[in-house]
Each structure stands twice: as structure tokens, then as C-alpha cells.
Amino acid sequence: MKKIEAIVRPAKLEALKDAFLEAGIKGMTISQVQGCGNQHGWKEYYRGSEVIVNMLPKIMLTVVVEDDKVDSTVELICNTARTGEVGDGKIFVFPVDEVVRIRTGERGDEAI
């Protein structure tokens, strides 16, 4: 099993949720995050002082999938979230040693 974390533009959230559901990925965690990278921020003025805003709002989607679904899930995220502009985001893939469904005690793939 792998945990996939995708940090994407907030405007892509609904399209990604729809794509996940269509692909049979039912469980996901969505967090509002801020980040910086190659995408530069902007300047604002507050009470006459210049303020550089370089932490930009993003959405982090987290899903856990079976090993054989990792490539297709990453491809789905890329195809859905890509605009071709700086700031499209990043995808991180981590190994998952164990998953336990608290309600039933199920473990492994059955708990996803």
C-alpha cells in the first residue's frame, strides 16, 4: 500500500474529487495548506508598507491505495490538476506499513 499526497491548486479540488470517485477511490483526506516554491507570490501594501506575500493557498489531497493502483492514481492526478503553469503542485508517494479500520478492526487492503 502507498499513501499519495498531492498538493494542488484550490481551483482543481472539485475536478479531482470527481475523478477520484469515478476511478473508485472513495476515501480521501483534504486539507487547506499554504506553500511556496517556484511560483512566486505578490506584493501588497498594508498601512503604507510593502508586504511580500509568498505563501500561497493550496489544497493537499491524501489517499491510500493498493500498490497496483499507484501509477494510475498519480496519472489521474496529473491529468486532472495540470494547467501547464508554474504552481500546478507536487505529488509525493510514501510506503504504508499497515492500515487498520478502527470500527471493524479490518487490516490491510480491506481497511482502505
Q: What are the language-model segments listed below?
A:
Residues 1-112:
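Positively charged, small/polar-rich N-terminal and surface patches that mediate targeting and assembly
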